[in-house]
């Protein structure tokens, strides 16, 4: 299905510059778009591509439009945030193009008689829904999804294949969980019960039952193979509109504030609180029992071992450098204590040459008391 630029502006806002009757039916990058496609400019360093693109129209902001040498025979939708505008248009195109699954329960699904399934829900092959679970309106559960006893899945949510949501969890409206994610598995809680030291040590680790759940608010998206542990006593909490990438681990009792984004391979240890509107980079490790303020940014591969109580950007990772340069730096790090002592000795010698011996040193040399 194609839309005129005027149709798009009426739905999403903005201003058409050029031919409002131009029709576009899909989206593409500036350097690949054709006459029936819509492209966007989000980064001004690609401004030159706007001059050469074959796109039927370009989403652009007013400042970048003013920089163009020519607008002849080109069409634009002017909007303050072309990237977000692109995302909304793309959602519409995808929703219209996607095949619509018919509501109902696949014959191979296993549904406990006490579970409540909305008539508009789509329950795919080999799905399991346990006792007391509630599946809301327009929910889609793809193949092999498992919903534990007493768990509630809010209206409009979509769980992709092989997602497992353990017992006693709550997912609000429009939650998206991608394939292989696990929600509500046991938190990593074990009490040490050992006696003695070394080879004489005896005893074991005692498992602490994890009796909390996981509570996920509306419009959260969770990436593939991500795991969110259930709380030890109270729920692990993910607030509204949080976006979590693939392969992220969130430990028990954590709280992730609204509108925070967490990139792939991040690991967040138990009982950590992350504020609202935070950005956690890929492969970041956050220790347990720490707090991050609202509007904190932690760059990729950083390690957070203590609370960050002020908004801002934090980094602790080493950027990649030439291998030989890294080896030289590593050698210096191994000898940093010796270098510090040598510098201190040289500083003391320079001060003594400039100012004379310190009073303590002079009195000790003559045997006088200070």
UniProtKB/Swiss-Prot annotation:
Full protein name: UDP-3-O-acylglucosamine N-acyltransferase
Pathway membership: Bacterial outer membrane biogenesis; LPS lipid A biosynthesis
CC per GO annotation: membrane
Record field: transmembrane: none
EC primary class: transferase
Gene Ontology terms for molecular function: N-acyltransferase activity
Record gene name: lpxD
EC number: 2.3.1.191
Quaternary structure note: Homotrimer.
Keyword field contains Acyltransferase: yes
Stored InterPro entries: Hexapep, Hexapep_transf_CS, LpxD, Trimer_LpxA-like_sf, UDP_GlcNAc_AcTrfase_non-rep
Catalytic activity field: a UDP-3-O-[(3R)-3-hydroxyacyl]-alpha-D-glucosamine + a (3R)-hydroxyacyl-[ACP] = a UDP-2-N,3-O-bis[(3R)-3-hydroxyacyl]-alpha-D-glucosamine + holo-[ACP] + H(+)
Protein purpose: Catalyzes the N-acylation of UDP-3-O-acylglucosamine using 3-hydroxyacyl-ACP as the acyl donor. Is involved in the biosynthesis of lipid A, a phosphorylated glycolipid that anchors the lipopolysaccharide to the outer membrane of the cell.
Region: Disordered, residue numbers: 348-370
């Amino acid at each position: 299905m194609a839309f005129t630029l005027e149709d798009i502006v009426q739905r999403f806002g903005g201003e058409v510059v050029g031919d409002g009757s131009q029709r576009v039916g899909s989206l593409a990058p500036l350097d690949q778009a054709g006459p029936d496609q819509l492209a966007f400019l989000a980064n001004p360093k690609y401004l030159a591509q706007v001059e050469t693109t074959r796109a039927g129209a370009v989403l652009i902001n007013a400042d970048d439009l003013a920089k163009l040498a020519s607008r002849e025979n080109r069409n634009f939708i002017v909007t303050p945030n072309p990237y977000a505008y692109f995302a909304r248009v793309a959602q519409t195109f995808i929703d219209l193009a996607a095949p619509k699954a018919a509501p109902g329960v696949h014959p191979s699904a296993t549904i406990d008689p006490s579970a409540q399934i909305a008539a508009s829900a789509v329950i795919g092959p080999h799905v399991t829904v346990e006792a007391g679970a509630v599946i809301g309106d327009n929910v889609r559960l793809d193949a092999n999804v498992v919903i534990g006893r007493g768990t509630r899945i809010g209206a409009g949510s979509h769980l992709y294949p092989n997602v497992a949501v353990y017992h006693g969890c709550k997912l609000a409206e429009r939650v998206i969980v991608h394939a292989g994610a696990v929600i509500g598995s046991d938190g990593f809680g074990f009490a040490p019960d050992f006696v003695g030291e070394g080879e004489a040590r005896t005893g074991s680790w005692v498992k602490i039952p994890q009796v909390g759940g996981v509570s996920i608010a509306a419009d959260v998206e969770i990436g593939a193979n991500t795991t969110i542990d259930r709380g030890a006593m109270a729920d692990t909490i993910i607030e509204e509109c949080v976006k979590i990438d693939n392969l992220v681990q969130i430990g028990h009792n954590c709280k992730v504030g609204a509108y925070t984004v967490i990139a792939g391979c991040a690991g967040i240890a138990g009982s950590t609180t992350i504020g609202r509107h935070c950005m956690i980079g890929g492969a970041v490790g956050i220790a347990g029992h720490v707090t991050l303020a609202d509007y904190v940014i932690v760059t990729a591969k950083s390690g957070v071992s203590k609370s960050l109580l002020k908004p801002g950007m934090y980094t602790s990772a080493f950027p990649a450098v030439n291998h030989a340069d890294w080896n030289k730096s590593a050698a210096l790090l191994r000898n940093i204590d010796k270098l510090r002592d040598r510098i201190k000795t040289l500083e003391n010698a320079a001060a003594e040459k400039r100012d004379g011996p310190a009073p303590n040193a002079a009195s000790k040399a003559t045997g006088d008391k200070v």
